[in-house]
């Protein structure tokens, strides 16, 4: 009798497995939809609109040709020195932002778009090349090309752009944005504000803008 019960359970398990395999596409779509429903509903955003993600208020300052939204922290999230050099790739700020990446992913899933950060120096040198981040800080070019859409704050904040590089005037100075919106440079071990940004993927197709 006990053996018959075991055989009956195994048969039910086999039947269940067969049903799952027969409907695996439906199951995959169901699981995907269930996961997506756990993520934050993000409304359509215009330039200047804000949304709170990972307990930070983000303001849209740019939209690219694919309709992706560039979201900049509306205020300072931390204060830190830039590191031991002006190379963003080795900055402790960059490493700290990896924690923020995970918090953002928990709320919006795969809607965060990789950022190619161009570390072309202010004096025209490319020693540092580029790097890829999911959350980063603005470069000089990204700031100046969108300055009119970027809210000024009371603190000066770091840019990822070096003032020069080892093949030029050295690796000591980093560009920053002052509280008046002007751009200057500071020694890498100064304590400056960190104002990160990320790119929010468009899920509605290519923008008509």
Where do the model's predicted regions map?
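Short, Lys/Arg-enriched N-terminal segments with co-localized hydrophobic residues
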Residues: 1-6
């Amino acid at each position: 009798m006990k053996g018959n019960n075991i055989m009956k359970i195994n048969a039910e398990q086999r039947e269940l497995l067969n049903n799952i395999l027969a409907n695996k596409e439906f199951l995959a779509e169901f699981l995907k939809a269930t996961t997506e429903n756990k993520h934050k509903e993000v409304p359509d955003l215009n330039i200047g609109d804000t949304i709170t993600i990972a307990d930070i208020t983000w303001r849209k300052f740019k939209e690219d040709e694919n309709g992706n939204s560039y979201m900049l922290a509306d205020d300072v999230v931390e204060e830190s020195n830039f590191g031991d050099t002006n190379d963003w790739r080795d900055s402790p700020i960059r490493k700290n932002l990896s924690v923020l990446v995970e918090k953002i992913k928990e709320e919006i899933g795969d809607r965060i778009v990789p950022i190619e950060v161009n570390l072309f120096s202010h004096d025209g040198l490319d020693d540092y090349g580029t790097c890829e981040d999911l959350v980063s800080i603005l470069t000089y070019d990204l700031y100046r090309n969108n300055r009119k859409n970027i809210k000024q704050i009371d603190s000066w904040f770091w840019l990822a752009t070096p003032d020069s590089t080892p093949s030029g005037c050295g690796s000591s100075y980093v560009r920053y944005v002052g509280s008046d919106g002007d751009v200057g440079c500071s020694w890498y071990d100064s304590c400056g504000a960190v104002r990160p940004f990320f790119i929010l993927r468009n899920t509605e197709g290519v923008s008509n803008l």
